[in-house]
């Protein structure tokens, strides 16, 4: 059974396994997510479910959104995502998906928006080496050569240069769910995941399985 859920990153901590080894984990509040809509291959051309996460006040939703949520019989949600699944018959509109759909040992892919770093140079953005910091050096943190001179007389596309860093969609593949705290709808996921604390993430079964 393919599984997916929307969650929110709480932060990082560490736990100990049965051998006393320290495991760094990210704490994620996963669900509950309400099923808003089912899409079928006959009607829509593909199979998918649409889910919503985190309740919001009524004034924050416009009339079409209110109608969409009312049709599903669920409260207004802040985040809405669609997951392409083949086993949509196992889901019903109006029901909830909770953290216990996953189990300890599952391998998942986690997608979020990375932390924005603003405009950064090539040393921070692309791990370039810097020049000598000696008094006589005139080259410290500059980009250096950007290409040849008369031929081809231009800078190639996708050249690594200074620019906006972070604040992009990012996915970490094939990481392990260490522990599921079903009573609190919390997942402990091994290692770090994209985004800041309180950032929204999507957790799916890994594509590498």
Swiss-Prot record:
GO BP of this protein: translation
InterPro entries, per database record: Ribosomal_uL3, Ribosomal_uL3_bac/org-type, Ribosomal_uL3_CS, Transl_B-barrel_sf
Residue segments, region Disordered: 144-165
GO cellular component: cytosolic large ribosomal subunit
Keyword field: Ribonucleoprotein, Ribosomal protein, RNA-binding, rRNA-binding
GO MF term (any one): structural constituent of ribosome
Any matching Pfam family: Ribosomal_L3
Domain of life according to the entry: Bacteria
UniProt entry tagged with the keyword Ribonucleoprotein: yes
Assembly and interaction partners: Part of the 50S ribosomal subunit. Forms a cluster with proteins L14 and L19.
Family to which the UniProt record says this protein belongs: Belongs to the universal ribosomal protein uL3 family.
Function as written in the Swiss-Prot or TrEMBL entry: One of the primary rRNA binding proteins, it binds directly near the 3'-end of the 23S rRNA, where it nucleates assembly of the 50S subunit.
NCBIfam families: L3_bact
Protein name as catalogued: Large ribosomal subunit protein uL3
Classification lineage: Bacteria, Bacillati, Bacillota, Clostridia, Eubacteriales
Gene: rplC
């Amino acid at each position: 059974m393919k599984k997916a859920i929307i969650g929110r990153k709480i932060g990082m901590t560490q736990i100990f396994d049965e051998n006393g080894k320290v495991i760094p984990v990210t704490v994620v509040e996963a669900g509950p997510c309400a099923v808003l809509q089912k899409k079928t291959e006959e009607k829509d051309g593909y199979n998918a479910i649409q889910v919503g996460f985190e309740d919001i006040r009524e004034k924050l939703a416009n009339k079409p959104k209110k109608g969409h949520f009312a049709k599903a019989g669920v409260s207004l949600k802040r985040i809405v995502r669609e997951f392409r699944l083949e086993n949509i018959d196992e889901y019903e509109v109006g029901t909830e998906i909770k953290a216990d759909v996953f189990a300890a040992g599952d391998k998942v892919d986690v997608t979020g928006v990375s932390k924005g770093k603003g405009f950064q140079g090539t040393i921070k953005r692309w791990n370039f080496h810097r020049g000598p910091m000696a008094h006589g050096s005139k080259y410290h943190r500059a980009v250096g050569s950007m290409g040849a001179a008369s031929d081809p007389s231009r800078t190639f596309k996708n050249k690594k240069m200074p620019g906006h860093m972070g604040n992009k969609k990012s996915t970490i593949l094939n990481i392990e769910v260490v522990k599921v705290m079903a009573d609190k709808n919390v997942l402990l996921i091994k290692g770090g995941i994209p985004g800041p604390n309180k950032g929204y993430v999507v957790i799916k079964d890994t594509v590498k399985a």
